[in-house]
């Protein structure tokens, strides 16, 4: 999934 503006479940590149 592309990097979202907010980590609403998609935190794969969110450090």
From Swiss-Prot:
Keywords: Amidation, Neuropeptide, Secreted. The modification Leucine amide is found at residue 15. Its main location: secreted. This is Extended FMRFamide-12. One of its GO terms (cellular component) is extracellular region. The keyword Secreted applies. It is found in: Secreted. FMRFamides and FMRFamide-like peptides are neuropeptides. It comes from Tyrannophasma gladiator. GO terms for biological process: neuropeptide signaling pathway.
